[in-house]
Amino acid sequence: ANPADEPKSIFISAVSTAPLGASHEFALQGREKEFQAGIDALSKLTKGQVHLSVQGIAGSFLNDINGVALHKVSGKHPAGNVGVQIANVDPVNAGEKVWCVHPQDVAAIGSLFLNGKYDPSRVIALTGSEVENPEYYSVIRGAMIEDLVVGKLKEGNVRLISGDPLTGSSVKRKGALGFYHDS
């Protein structure tokens, strides 16, 4: 995004419908204050609305975020795709700009304003049929794939993907986790 541009709105999709995608709800556990502070900061960057799409899980802190237009999304993929949400909620016309922010980046922005420090950590899901025990890990952005998978994969020829199987990128063991990826 060009910082000189003012977006007509900002979208955050906390809905993961892609296969083998990480749960945003799980990834944000313990970062509720940072997430709200990030929303507060983002709301100052647009005269329009900050849109937050959620799955509407009962008891989720995401249902109670202040300063957003809350959208409860359900259904199969691509329902969680932020582009689908924009097209249905606030379509972009010629010359207009809409910004999209990953939920964990909202928390990182909030952390910067609350603590004065950038937090490069990200919660990721190591998943797939060739993973011995699929689980979540807290890593630093750009973590080396080899460090993430050593001793965690089944024997044989394994295809490694940074991101989900539909939109991710094939990576080598010596490669790195994509900047925006959480699986």
What is each model feature region?
Residues 1-183:
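Buried, small/hydrophobic-residue-enriched core segments of structured protein domains
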